Amino acid sequence: MSDYREELKNKETLRLREIQRELPPFVQAFFRGIAQTTSTKTRLAYAYDLRIFFRYLYEEHRTLGGIEPKDLTAAHLSEVTSEDIDCFMEYLSYYIRPDYENPAYGKEMHNEEKGKSRKLAAVRMLFKYLYKKKIISADPASLVDTPKIHEKAIVRLDVN
């Protein structure tokens, strides 16, 4: 492996560990569990997406609201329903994300179908892993439909 790729992988690994500190402790086991079958980039993308999901639970969930993400337990996820995940998908249309470099400011975020699908994939993987390991008794994420991705029109260049 080239030095550049090795250096990039090391940076991504350190960034992943940094983000995991903001997430519930059981998420670390999830990342260890998928490490053999996913790339560092995939795990990092999942970490970003799960951070948004847990921030949503903190800000919006009817019973988990107000519980810091790093204080959540796997038992708390038993309170999450497929309807909650549907609401999360709607939340992704527009939300204000904290600026992690400068916490006093927020950044407006919008997600179209592709962004929502990617975030749903991360949530599904987490619930699937926890269900498979018998940490939770149900997998509500599997009941949520993936957003339909609309095809972009093919733009052809004309010869002048």
Role assignments for model-derived ranges:
Residues M1-L44, E59:
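N-terminal DNA-binding module of tyrosine recombinases/phage integrases
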Residues V27-K41, R51-A153:
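N-terminal core-binding DNA-recognition domain of tyrosine recombinases/integrases
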Residues D158:
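Short, conserved phosphate/pyrophosphate- and ester-handling motifs at nucleotide-, phospho-/glycolipid
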